[in-house]
Amino acid sequence: MSHKSDLIATNIQKYLQQRQQKELLRFITCGSVDDGKSTLMGRLLHDSKLIFEDQLASIVADSKKVGTQGDRLDLALLVDGLQSEREQGITIDVAYRYFSTDKRKFIIADTPGHEQYTRNMATGASNCDLAIILIDARKGLQTQTRRHSFICSLLGIKHVIVAVNKMDTVGYSQQIYKSIQDEYLKLAGSLQIPDIRFVPISALDGDNVVSKSPKMPWFRGSPLMHYLETIKIDYAYTDEFRFPVQLVCRPNSEFRGFQGTIVSGSAKIGDTIRVMPSGKITTIKSILSFDGELNEAEAGQSITITTYDEIDISRGDMIVHKDAISHVSSMLRANIVWMSEQPLIEYKDYYIKFLTKQVIGSVNKFNYKTDINTLKEVACGTLELNEIATIELKLSEPVCFDSYQKNRTTGAFIIIDRLTNVTAGAGMVIKPLAANDKKDSTNDYSEFELELNALIRKHFPHWDAKNLRE
C-alpha cells in the first residue's frame, strides 16, 4: 500500500503516534441516486493513495465485468461491496471507509440515494459532523437532495459542502453551476445549516477533488479535500456532564459502582452530582476505569463511579452535576424519521429507547409532517415509510433527556416495534411538554437532610421547622 508518509517505512511507531494524535472528522456523502457518491469516495481513497495493490488489481478486473465506465476504472466499486450493489450499480447499505491525510483522520459514510433506502441514510448521518451533498450538474436538485438536506438539518449537522458533480458532462459550465448554487441557497433558507460551501467537481476525472482543476478557472474557491482538512468543527455541543447508567456493578457486599460511558462533559472525584429522574444528590467517591483509578474523566470514557451515599441508582438513570439538570418528563415533542413499512399511527404502543432507558410510549398527537419538495407543514394522521413529522409522544413513565439541539446524544431516541423488535423510527427531542418537567423542590436536599427534617418535625414540633418536602 502506498502512502504519502515516508514514516511507514522508516519509523512505524512514530507514524502510528502521529496518526493517533490527528483530529478525527466523520462525514457523510449523500444526494440523489446516481449523483456519484460512491465514485467520489473511491476518488478520495484513490488520490489519497490509501488503496492496497491487490485492491486496485481487483477493481481493475471488476471494472471490466460489472463496471459502468466502459474501459475506464470504476472507482465506485471500491465502496459498493455488496454483490447486489455491484450488479445494480447502486448503493444499498451504508458503507463506512477510513482514510487519513497529513492533517486529519476521516471516517466516511457513503449512503444510498434511492428513496426506499432513506432510513439507511438517516442512520449514517446520525453520528456525522459534516455532510457532502452531491448534485448531478445535468439534473440539478432532486427530491432526494431536498430530503437528505432536511434530514441533515434535523440531525444537527452544522457543516455542509454542496459538491456539484459531473461538471465534465456539461462542459464545465459556470452558468449551470451558478444556477444550482442559487437554487440550493433558496432551499437552505428553510433549513438550520449555518455553514454551507460549494465546489464544482468531477469525481470520475478528479477535478477539484484533491487538487484544483485547471478546467474551471472561473472557480475561485478551494478543492474539496482542502475544505475537509481545514473546516473547523465544534465538537462540544454541551459541556454539561451526562452519564447514563448502563449497569450497577456489585461484585461483593463491599463494593457498589455504577458503570457507563460519559456522553458529554466531565466529572472528577469530589463533584456533587444529582441522579435523574429521582433528583437525589450525592458526591463522587471514586472513578474507576480499565486503566485503574482516575481523578477525572471526560466524554467518551467508559468508567465506574462510586458514591459516598447509599442512594437508589439503577440502569437507565442519568447522573448529572447538581446544578446542570436535564429535563424529566413523560410527554415530549419530537421530530420523527419513520423507517418502517408499517405506518406510525396514534395511540399504538411502541418501545421507546433513550440510551440505556427503555419505556413504552405512543403518539399522542401528530402536529404535522413535512412536505419534502416544499418544506411546508402538512396535516397528517399517520406516518409512512421515509416520511418526516413532528409529533407529541406520551411515555409510560418520566424519563430524563435534553433537547436534541443541545445534546445530540441525550436528545435522541429510537422507536422499536414491540412485536418484531425492529427499529421503526428515529426521534430527535424538541422540548418536554408535561408539567413534571418542573424542578422538584426536594432536589436541593440530600436524602439524609430530608429524613432528618422529618424526624425534627415529628419529635420537636415546637421548633416550627419547615417541611422540606413541600
From Swiss-Prot:
Keyword annotations: ATP-binding, GTP-binding, Nucleotide-binding, Nucleotidyltransferase, Transferase
Known EC number: 2.7.7.4
Region: G3, residue numbers: 110-113
Domain tr-type G: 22-238
Catalysis performed (reactions): sulfate + ATP + H(+) = adenosine 5'-phosphosulfate + diphosphate
Region (G2): 89-93
Pathway: Sulfur metabolism; hydrogen sulfide biosynthesis; sulfite from sulfate: step 1/3
GO biological processes: hydrogen sulfide biosynthetic process; sulfate assimilation
Domain of life (superkingdom): Bacteria
Main enzyme class: transferase
Binding site for GTP: 31-38, 110-114, 165-168
Region G4, annotated ranges: 165-168
Membership in a protein family: Belongs to the TRAFAC class translation factor GTPase superfamily. Classic translation factor GTPase family. CysN/NodQ subfamily.
Function: With CysD forms the ATP sulfurylase (ATPS) that catalyzes the adenylation of sulfate producing adenosine 5'-phosphosulfate (APS) and diphosphate, the first enzymatic step in sulfur assimilation pathway. APS synthesis involves the formation of a high-energy phosphoric-sulfuric acid anhydride bond driven by GTP hydrolysis by CysN coupled to ATP hydrolysis by CysD.
Protein name: Sulfate adenylyltransferase subunit 1
Organism: Francisella tularensis subsp. tularensis (strain WY96-3418)
This protein's encoding gene: cysN
